[in-house]
């Protein structure tokens, strides 16, 4: 089995004296795990960080066995964010969520492009937390658990959508949801439209929505909690006054 594809590094852990086991999110083939030789070298370390974009060349004797990969860097990778610890926290959370949520060897191009869009936005402090929420919503969509924010689940109304049902992931209008206000999730306007501006509390509301459904539909069935890096991101955004 051999292939070549663009990929993002999701994680890398030391294996032996000089190698590493690397999780990759590829553009066309989904998540793959591979052994990378020489990973301890000074040349290799920068593009084995989470979020680094590479050309991966993969080879395995048997299709059901873990193979070996060589990696060639594309661009400068996450090193440009080393002076932005909050953005690095966002990148770490995104890589951890993708690594934990995506099955191996199953194509998920939507997840690849959602991560690509987030990484491009991380250099813009004013917008990336909202783009992170959209990344998680896109991941849910690609896994078959997409939110339906197009109309009110109760009335079919297209207007004044301000809640999400925590059971179904469908939008609910203000009028229909008011009697159940305490049982519904607040829906921030930016999740409905790219033109929706951000006000205080919007990012927290968005992360609460995507976190709820990631837990309910993805991680709980796998008997796993949300990744610690994702929990820490919420804490750090709060400390920075960015929620």
Curated annotation (Swiss-Prot):
Q: Which GO terms describe its biological process?
A: DNA recombination; double-strand break repair
Keyword terms: DNA damage, DNA recombination, DNA repair
Q: Which InterPro entries match?
A: ARFGAP/RecO, DNA_rep/recomb_RecO_N, NA-bd_OB-fold, RecO, RecO_C
A GO term from the CC aspect: bacterial nucleoid
Does Ubl conjugation count among this protein's keywords?
no
Q: What does this protein do?
A: Involved in DNA repair and RecF pathway recombination.
Family the entry assigns: Belongs to the RecO family.
Q: Extract the PANTHER family matched here.
A: DNA REPAIR PROTEIN RECO
Q: Which NCBIfam families match?
A: reco (TIGR00613)
Name assigned to this protein: DNA repair protein RecO
């Amino acid at each position: 089995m051999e292939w070549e594809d663009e990929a993002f590094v999701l994680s890398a852990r030391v294996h032996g004296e000089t190698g590493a086991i690397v999780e990759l999110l590829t553009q066309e083939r989904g998540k793959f795990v591979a052994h990378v030789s020489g990973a301890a070298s000074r040349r290799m370390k920068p593009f084995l960080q989470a979020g680094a974009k590479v050309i991966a060349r993969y080879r395995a004797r048997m299709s059901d066995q873990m193979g070996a990969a060589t990696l060639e860097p594309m661009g400068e990778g996450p090193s440009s964010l080393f002076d932005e610890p909050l953005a690095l926290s966002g990148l770490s959370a995104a890589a951890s969520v993708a690594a934990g949520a995506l099955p191996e060897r199953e194509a998920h191009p939507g997840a690849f492009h959602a991560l690509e869009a987030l990484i491009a936005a991380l250099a813009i402090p004013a917008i990336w937390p909202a783009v992170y929420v959209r990344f998680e919503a896109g991941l849910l969509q690609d896994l078959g658990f997409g939110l339906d924010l197009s109309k009110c689940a109760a009335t079919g109304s297209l207007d004044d959508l301000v809640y999400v049902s925590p059971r179904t992931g469908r939008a609910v209008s203000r009028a229909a949801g008011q009697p159940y206000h305490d049982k519904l999730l607040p829906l921030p306007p930016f999740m409905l439209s790219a033109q929706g501006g951000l006000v205080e509390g919007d990012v927290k509301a968005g992360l609460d929505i995507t976190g709820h459904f990631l837990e309910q539909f993805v991680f709980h069935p796998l008997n796993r909690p949300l990744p610690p890096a994702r929990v820490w991101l919420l804490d750090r955004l709060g400390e920075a006054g960015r929620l």
